[in-house]
Structure formats: structure tokens, C-alpha cells
Amino acid sequence: MHAMTFKAILLLGLLALVSTSASIAFAKEVRATITEVPPFNRNSFPSDFIFGTAASSYQYEGEGRVPSIWDNFTHQYPEKIADGSNGDVAVDQFHHYKEDVAIMKYMNLDAYRLSISWPRILPTGRASGGINSTGVDYYNRLINELLANDITPFVTIFHWDLPQALEDEYGGFLNHTIVNDFRDYADLCFNLFGDRVKHWITVNEPSIFTMNGYAYGIFAPGRCSPSYNPTCTGGDAGTEPDLVAHNLILSHAATVQVYKKKYQEHQNGIIGISLQIIWAVPLSNSTSDQKAAQRYLDFTGGWFLDPLTAGQYPESMQYLVGDRLPKFTTDEAKLVKGSFDFVGINYYTSSYLTSSDASTCCPPSYLTDSQVTFSSQRNGVFIGPVTPSGWMCIYPKGLRDLLLYIKEKYNNPLVYITENGMDELDDPSQSLEESLIDTYRIDSYYRHLFYVRSAIGSGANVKGFFAWSLLDNFEWNEGFTSRFGLNFVNYTTLTRYHKLSATWFKYFLARDQEIAKLDISAPKARWSSSTMIKEEKRKPKWAIQAF
């Protein structure tokens, strides 16, 4: 298969779609705070800044493996997935990895963030139960293919697909036993792949795994308090989220310790963790709302960053959660503190925060412990355009604010933005040509990158940006109804097609001096008066061609 070929006239056709201004009809408040974005490209960033895309094993790979908790969850409870689908095939990267690396090469990407499937490597969850050579061979082939194309692998050790065997045996992350099993699994990964992998991420979005899996019950393993949702598989949202997070932190720290003691000196790599953080904007200028915004940050990003930098949970969590919050022993605190070389930040949206007293409304729950209420609106006006899925508002300035907050509060750590993106709904009524036009996605990336550059200019130690995602894929409880990809996937044939955003990235990231001089500003995107993202679907200027 081959990549799309663009002749000079087609390039001109593309650039005709790309205007010198990047104006979005944002809601009034956002329009007042977002600066019109001038032209810039990759040469506007430091020379060592890395651009990549991100993916995960369960969402991408397909092919046979023993079950993870997500295999079990999607098969046992298909009604909990928007379209009843699962990741059995996903986008079949297991068989299409060479094509996918070719896409990355076409897009001029520097790096690819992938994850390793724990049950694909260790069917029982432990090396004592045998190592799956087929799984090891797949990751070796993928890593080698990336390196052969000058693409740097960033590897996540755990992106939510825990072996079902360990969940069945002792409850997974509810049990402290997981810490040793996680460490040993990571040790094996370092041994197998660390000669070529120089950037490791221990855990992806531990707060989301914890909150959605053990408080809301909408992600595997589907646990929550019965009073919140009687269809959950069991659970207690007042204790389990904090316990799971505690064991995730200890698993992370034990893994970092192994890497630094056994591998880092001779493998010359670095290791960190990826956290999703929603930026918190006080609903008003009141002291109460400002404190609410800080508490929200404490209960999300601070939940993990405070232990990693100070060896203990945020004071607000200790006070409000009380005895339900696990405590680090002296030795554990020493192990956890400083256990990172970098912090990965996954940023998608921001929210308004105000105080609420939930202390007497309901049984104790992580969902109410912070005593805040968050909203996407202030006085009926959204903080930013709402994406089709409804949970995300596009607020690029929040990324700059978050990066500068981390710089000031956590002593300016090395940061990679390990995910950023926006969704669109799968719409079978659209033609293929229409499905490839995503100027709103280009505009969103352009503005986020503008604010990343601004944060760097203000001293934030940011060294990379990964778009979510390379391809449309299985989006957890949204199944295949939500498309985040820069490249369109026909889920029946598994054929890949470049969206306009993929080709925009190709030229934004071009190193060729003549191409780099071109104005690759974001095209104008259309937004409805209700601030729900919509797009005028125009036929592309190039022939639709699979690769």
C-alpha cells in the first residue's frame, strides 16, 4: 500500500484552504481572552522539541491475546459501551503496523507514543506463568520499524488493560499485591525493549482509570457504590478510588526505582508518568471559588503530583477525606518522592469551579469529597466551543495556564504533553470526502500549540507534544462512535485515509526550508451560534486515495 501523493498543484489546493488568520466564533468570554494567532510552524519551537501522536494497545492492536479487564468488561457488559462494540479487532494495528508507521513518516512526526499490553506479554500477569513470545515479537517489530523510520518510541507500560487473571485472583489494584506484580512486569519490559526505548511512561491517566473504573463505574472493571449506580459490578466510591490510586502510585514508584537501579545508567533513558488534568477556572473572583478551583486541582493532578514531589497527598485531600485516605509509610514516602524524570500532561478541556458542601448530601464518595461543583458554563456561556460528544469544551488558553501552574507549583519539571485532541461523532451518512474535512481540528491544534509556545516563552520546561490520536480508534465506553483520529479509519475494511488535519501536520512539521516558509496557519472553522462544533463539509482538493 502507498501513501497519498501530492503534486505541486494539489499542494496549492490544500493551501488555498488554509487562511492567514485562525478565527473561530468562540463564545463571548473566550473571544475576549484568546489572542488572534499569527502564523508559525515547527521552526518556531526549540530545535529539540518533539512532535508525535499517541495510541494505546487495547484501542489499537486487536489480534489474539488472553483477556484484560477491558476484554472482560466489553464482553460481559456490552450495554455499557455506546455501540456495544469492543476492542477485539480495534483498528488491527497488530497487522497494519507498517502502514501506520508509514503514515507517521508521511506526517513528518518525530515520535510515536504506544503502550504495551500486559496480558499480551504475560498471559497470567506474571513471568512465572510464561512469557508470550508472539507478543514480544510484535513489539520488537513495531519498535524496530519506528526506529528504522527515524521515529522515536515513547512507551507506556500500563494503559488500563490489566490482565483479567490478576483481577480475578486478588482484585487487581484494590490489593497491594499488584505493586510487586506491576514492578516485575515493568522490569521485564525494560529488559526486553530498553536497549531501544529511551522514554518510558509508567501509567497513563491514573486519575481517569481510578475515577471512571471505581467511582463512576463506566470503565473497566466497572465498580462504584450501589447507591450511585446499581448496575455496577460492586464497589465503594468512598474508599476504593483512593486505595486504587495509592496502589497505582506505589506501583509507579517501585517501577521507577527498578529502572533507575538496574537500567537507566546503561540504557540512557528517562521515565515518567502521564496525568490527565482539566484546568480549573474559578466561576467568580470570590475567594470561595478560587479555593474551589485549587481543591479541584488538588483532587485531580495534585492527587499524584504532590506525592511524587513532596511524598504526601495534598493537605486539602488529607483534611477532607480523613481516615479514608491511605497514608504512605516513611519508607514509601521516600520511594515515591522524586520518582520521575518527567511529567506527561494530557490536556483536553477546562471547567469552571465553585464551592459546594456535599458533606451531608450522600454517602462518602471521591466524587463529592472535594466539595466543588464544576460546570462548562458561566452565566449560560460555555467556556469554549463544545465538541460533538458533549464532554469537552475547546479552551486552548487553559493549556498555557496549566503548564505555568505546574511550573510554579512543582518546581518546573520536564514536561511532555502526551495527549491533546478533539473528537467528532461517527456519522455514517457522510461521504468519505466529507469525513476527511476537519478544519475545526486543525484550528484546535493550532491554537493549543500557540499556547504551548507561549508557555515555553514564559519559562515552562515543555519538550514535546503528542496529538491524540494517529487514527480513529476504539474510544473506551464511547466505542467507535467518537473519532479522535488525524487519519480516518473505515472500521469495516480497516482502510486508513488522511484527514485534512494529517496533511496540515505534514506541512506544519516540514523541515524543508521552502515548505517551512509557507504560511500554514489554521483554516477558518465554522462554529454554530450554540457553540457546538459543526463543519461545512467541502470536497477536498485532492483525490481520495487509500494507502
UniProtKB/Swiss-Prot annotation:
EC class name: hydrolase
Gene Ontology molecular function terms on file: beta-apiosyl-beta-glucosidase activity
Domain of life: Eukaryota
Any one GO biological process: carbohydrate metabolic process
Signal peptide stretch: 1-31
Glycosylation sites: 72, 132, 175, 285, 490
Activity regulation comment: Not inhibited by iron, calcium, mercury, manganese, zinc or EDTA.
Annotated residues for binding of a beta-D-glucoside: 59, 159, 204-205, 348, 419, 468, 475-476, 484
pH dependence: Optimum pH is 5.0-6.0. Half maximum activity is seen at pH 3.5 and 6.5.
Temperature profile: Optimum temperature is 65 degrees Celsius.
Disulfide bonds: 224-232
InterPro entries recorded: Glyco_hydro_1 (IPR001360), Glycoside_hydrolase_SF (IPR017853)
E.C. numbers: 3.2.1.161
Active site (catalytic residues): 205, 419
Catalyzed reactions per annotation: 7-[beta-D-apiofuranosyl-(1->6)-beta-D-glucopyranosyloxy]isoflavonoid + H2O = a 7-hydroxyisoflavonoid + beta-D-apiofuranosyl-(1->6)-D-glucose
UniProtKB keywords: Disulfide bond, Glycoprotein, Glycosidase, Hydrolase, Signal
Family to which the UniProt record says this protein belongs: Belongs to the glycosyl hydrolase 1 family.
Function: Hydrolyzes dalpatein 7-O-beta-D-apiofuranosyl-(1->6)-beta-D-glucopyranoside and dalnigrein 7-O-beta-D-apiofuranosyl-(1->6)-beta-D-glucopyranoside. Also has activity towards pNP-beta-D-fucoside and pNP-beta-D-glucoside, but not pNP-beta-cellobioside.
Assembly with partners or alone: Homotetramer.
Record-linked PANTHER family: GLYCOSYL HYDROLASE (PTHR10353), MYROSINASE 3-RELATED (PTHR10353:SF137)
Name of this chain's protein: Isoflavonoid 7-O-beta-apiosyl-glucoside beta-glycosidase
Species of provenance: Dalbergia nigrescens (Thai blackwood)
Lineage of producing organism: Eukaryota, Viridiplantae, Streptophyta, Embryophyta, Tracheophyta
